[in-house]
Amino acid sequence: MTEKPRIFIVSDSIGETAQYVVDATVSQFNGYLDSKRFSYVQTTRELNNIIKKATEQKTLIAYTLIDPRLREEIATLARKNNIYAVDIMGPMMEAFEEFFQKKPRLQPGLVHRLDKDYFKRVEAMEFTVKYDDSNDDRGVKEADVVLIGVSRTSKTPMCIYLSYRGYKAANIPLVPEVEPTPLIYENPDNKVIGLTIDPLLLNEIRQERLKSLGIDPESSYASIDRINVELEYAEKTMEKIGCPVIDVTNKSIEESANEVIDYLNG
């Protein structure tokens, strides 16, 4: 059995709640783990199949199962097979039941009911994917927020986080050789926000990125001289726009994104 660890996410609904908790936790360990999501799990047979797959490789199971019988079943199966399993929602539901003296509805997927806010988030996510790393005027015009910055300043993950919160987020890379759309200098509705980062940290991030792609980490893209040129260009561009600037150095995606939200709600 290979020892490369991975995570199974098991849910009787979509599994977004468990996925979000897992992603937030993984980010605290500065690493990446393979994960596989099993959605709409409703039967013991499905649980048995998942457990069987989990035994083939070092696996941690994180689950959100509303049905107490399924929660008990997966916990039992995991113990029998020496698999580490984490119940994300069960303890909270039990605490609520005891504290409020009320029985839960035990209906999977209630948090994702098709209401106005849900459709707003879906629309925002679709928008963000469409205008990721884009220099398109339409993205600037239609976005709730436009993030600008040099490569590897967390523009894309921040936009994804913002879209999950219902904001149409676009991002534009700043590269000295490519002039951004003139529309950002007009900064309509004060929606443009700049991102910056410590050059030495950016150097490390870019080198790691190149290594992961099998490219020489000493290439010009990751050189400190090139990084300083890009950051200087980005700083001048942001000054010309007159937009707020967020330093993302050593900050989590959530922390930086919430600073963006604070600016938007200013």
UniProtKB/Swiss-Prot annotation:
Residue numbers binding ADP: G149, V150, S151, R152, T153, S154, K155, T156
Highest taxon above the source species: Bacteria
Pfam families hit by this protein: Kinase-PPPase
UniProt entry keywords in alphabetical sequence: Kinase, Nucleotide-binding, Serine/threonine-protein kinase, Transferase
GO terms for MF: ADP binding; ATP binding; phosphotransferase activity, phosphate group as acceptor; protein serine/threonine kinase activity
Top-rank EC class of the record's enzyme: transferase
Record EC number: 2.7.11.32, 2.7.4.27
Similarity annotation: Belongs to the pyruvate, phosphate/water dikinase regulatory protein family. PDRP subfamily.
Role of this protein: Bifunctional serine/threonine kinase and phosphorylase involved in the regulation of the pyruvate, phosphate dikinase (PPDK) by catalyzing its phosphorylation/dephosphorylation.
This protein's name: Putative pyruvate, phosphate dikinase regulatory protein
Organism: Halothermothrix orenii (strain H 168 / OCM 544 / DSM 9562)
Lineage of origin: Bacteria, Bacillati, Bacillota, Clostridia, Halanaerobiales
